[in-house]
Amino acid sequence: MHTRLTPVSSSADSTDSACPARPDLTAPHAPTASSPAATFFTAPAVDPAVFDAVPDRRGTASLKWDSAVKRGRPEDVLPLWVADMDHATAPAVTSALLWRTRHGIFGYSEPDDAYRAALTGWFSRRYGWQVEAEWNTVTPGVVPALALAVRALTAPGETVLIEEPVYYPFRDVVEVNERTVAAVPLVRDADGVYRRDLAALEATIEATGARLLLLCNPHNPVGRVWSREELAALEEVTARHGVVVVADEIHADLALPGFATTPFASLSEAAAAHTITCTSPSKSFNLAGLQVANILISDAHLRRTFRRELATTGYSQPNTLGLTACRAAYESGDAWLDALREHIAAARAHVEALLERIEGIEAAPCEGTYLLWLDCSGFLKAAGLKPEQLDEVMLNEAGLWLDDGRIFGAGGEGFTRINVACPRATLDAALDRLEAAVATVTARAAEWAGRGRVALSA
């Protein structure tokens, strides 16, 4: 059995007396739908120590922490796979949700003026991008929006472009909707940095007639924050061939210090005219379970086409608490998010330092997201193992539940993805397990080399 981490109380363990009093909704100072300037909460200074508090998420129906056995993993596995954080969300968000739950009515809701002002203010403030409120369509998530775009803009059998390795739902939403995937490989240079092969992309467009590209910006899992110059070069190719770009920018807020996300549609009005931008606070504020995403489409025809497809699903009003949380995050979450980005940068550096002790495993350079892409090819070679055996080592030897690189498509073999958005104690425990497992398996391989046996026990 592996050692369990000792949890501390999380900020969610609030007593009723800690809840903000429900505002008098008739009072002049109360937040109202017609008062976009009204804010839920004034954010205090952020204590970085909050990110190292160890929460206990077991027993909360957590996909990450409560589903190991159901999904065929060991019960005591340490989960660092799915992309949600082991950090409580921003206090501004918690405060707004507490206020909303004290109100006690959870009827149908729609984005109001305050929500729209928070959304447009966020993109103006954080990206210098002047988004118009009418561009936005709320959906229950970015992945559903990707699927909607595929269905709205292509016919069964037509080709959709993706760049692999990439977040695996990119391929899934194409294939489940009976379209054809054309995967253009990213190229890893001598420094381990992934680059786009524009010549290969253009050749694929010409060969397949594809008119839709799913872009991951920043890129999951390889950690690239595409530069403005790289995106401008991509824009030139896609515009020349009439390709609509569906930009998954869910990790945009998580560019690490020293890097900045450029929204693809912000390049120019011409770029925006053939772009569907998929955004959400779910990664940056840990709100995935509240199911709210904002899909920004400046072109009126594209927007109508997308909304028509959304209407066929029967979806109309968004999650009430999702709207509340998103508005609060975008109104008052800046300082907390900046502190989180610093914490993630430190976590990344800490993991990279610890990997120096582990022969045969190294992290690809990471510019954004809280996901590290680990190259385990050296370890596999030393241990005499095949890429398909890597996940078995992680689960049964290290007691770690990571994401096997093969699920991200071509180029993922021999890699694994680890989520570093967790307390330092969790990272230390994970790297200790990894170091011990690599040492054990490698030593076993050396011992058995003369016997013609494989390193993993039968």
What is the meaning of each model-derived region?
Residues F106-E236, D253-A270, I276, A445-S457:
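Conserved core of the PLP fold type I
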Residues H2, A383-L385, Q389, V393-L402, ...:
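PLP-dependent enzyme catalytic core of the Aspartate aminotransferase-like
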Residues V46-G141, L148, S332, V441:
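N-terminal small-domain helix-loop-helix segment of the aminotransferase-like
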Residues P111, H274-G368:
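PLP-dependent aminotransferase class I/II
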Residues D338-R341, A349-A383, D404-G411, A445-S457:
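Conserved small-domain helix->loop->beta segment predominantly found in fold-type I
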Residues N177, T208, R240-H241, A271, ...:
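Helix C-cap/helix->beta junction micro-motif
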